[in-house]
């Protein structure tokens, strides 16, 4: 080891480095069309609780919609089933205890959008598309240069730390109605 290497290893301050890693984006049709009318009614019956003060610059419900409605919770459970099917393992074995921390509804109209953001410590984040109108903007992952144009009844899932956004809805015919949520690993009962 050179003196330079040795001196570098003696540093005590934080260092910042750029890491690039492949991330999984999962797309699944859920076959939950039979719930769409109820889900739309649940979302529309809520107030715009967030008032465009979050990254979502569109109508947005309370953060914990899944705790208020069994139909919404059914979508959350479908998302958890997808995570369980991945058979993730660590040194303790298969990780199979997950929970929905938060879930909300959003309605995007003309000129609505979502700013670039992550979902912090969430293991997985997802968006379920209840209604996707003609010319709706994609879910955009800038770092990967990936534009995902969703379909009705599709759930798109990605790691919570991945930066994503929704570009401004220009010339969109109708409204895009979604549920979104975050899944965490449940260490409480391991």
Per-region residue spans from a language model:
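Catalytic core of non-heme Fe(II) oxygenases with the double-stranded beta-helix
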Residues: 91-168, 173-190
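Non-heme Fe(II)/2-oxoglutarate
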Residues: 1-96
């Amino acid at each position: 080891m050179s003196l330079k290497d040795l001196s570098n290893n003696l540093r005590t301050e934080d260092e910042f480095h750029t890491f690039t890693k492949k991330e999984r984006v999962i797309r699944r049709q859920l076959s939950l069309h039979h719930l769409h009318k109820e889900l739309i009614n649940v979302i529309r019956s809520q107030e715009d609780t967030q008032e465009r003060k979050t990254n979502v610059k569109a109508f947005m419900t309370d953060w914990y919609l899944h705790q208020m409605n069994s139909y919404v919770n059914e979508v959350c459970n479908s998302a958890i089933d997808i995570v369980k099917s991945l058979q993730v393992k660590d040194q303790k074995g298969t990780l199979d205890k997950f929970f929905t921390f938060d879930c909300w509804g959003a309605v995007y109209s003309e000129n609505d959008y979502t700013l670039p953001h992550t979902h912090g410590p969430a293991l997985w984040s997802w968006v379920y598309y209840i209604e996707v109108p003609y010319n709706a903007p994609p879910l955009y992952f800038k770092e990967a240069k990936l534009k995902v144009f969703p379909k009705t009844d599709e759930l798109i899932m990605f790691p919570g730390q991945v930066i994503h956004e929704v570009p401004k809805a220009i010339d969109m015919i109708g409204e895009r109605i979604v549920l979104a949520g975050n899944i965490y690993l449940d260490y409480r009962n391991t």
